[in-house]
């Protein structure tokens, strides 16, 4: 509760820093990893029981996913990729803060421009992960299947390509810088809306936690 209150205070007082965002990111990663670790045994059992036909269907879904992502995020010219990325971020931020002001919109454009060809590394790493998952599924009766699936679900970062590892680090730094600047440029109404959204999210998470217990 104290940690959640800290988020409220930070948002309301407009005191957002790079180090604070790094801490929150680490907490989120740890929570995601913990959840993934909890479901891994059941996932391994389910995956091992799949038939060859089901695995073939899964691989077809992977292939379709990659085609769609390449068509949407890689085929457009770079200038269009940058513009569309900025539009997607503007939409996400507006949901949390309300309409962005001109200075904030300009900062979002600068953020998207700085990321450049990040889509290329993102899609390449997605294909890399899917290929490793398919390779593991092809040997799902082997003795090392469980640890391979755990690595794919829990320790995904250990399987990233070197290029994507660097790109992800750069992307995270750019995102933190963007958020710090946006909060610095935010209005009291935007900060109030953000606190309300955080409160609602916390209530939803608490409700889910109660259902699980």
What is each of the regions a protein language model found here?
Residues 1-213:
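Charge-rich (acidic/polar
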């Amino acid at each position: 509760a104290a940690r959640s209150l800290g988020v409220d205070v930070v948002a309301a007082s407009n005191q957002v820093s790079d180090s604070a965002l790094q801490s929150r990111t680490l907490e989120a990663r740890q929570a995601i990893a913990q959840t993934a670790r909890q479901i891994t045994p059941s996932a391994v059992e389910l995956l091992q029981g799949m038939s060859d036909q089901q695995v073939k269907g899964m691989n077809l879904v992977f292939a379709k996913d990659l085609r769609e992502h390449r068509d949407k995020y890689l085929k457009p010219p770079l200038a269009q990729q940058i513009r569309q990325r900025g539009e997607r971020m503007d939409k996400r931020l507006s949901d949390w803060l309300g309409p962005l002001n001109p200075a904030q919109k300009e900062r979002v454009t600068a953020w998207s421009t700085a990321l450049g060809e990040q889509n290329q590394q993102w899609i390449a790493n997605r294909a890399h992960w899917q290929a490793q998952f398919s390779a593991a599924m092809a040997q799902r009766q082997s003795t090392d299947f469980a640890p391979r699936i755990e690595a794919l679900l829990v320790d995904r970062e250990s399987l990233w390509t070197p290029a994507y590892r660097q790109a992800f680090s750069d992307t995270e730094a750019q995102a933190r810088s963007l958020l710090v600047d946006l909060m610095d440029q935010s209005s009291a109404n935007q900060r109030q809306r953000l606190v309300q959204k955080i409160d609602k999210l916390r209530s939803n998470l608490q409700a889910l936690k109660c259902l699980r217990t």
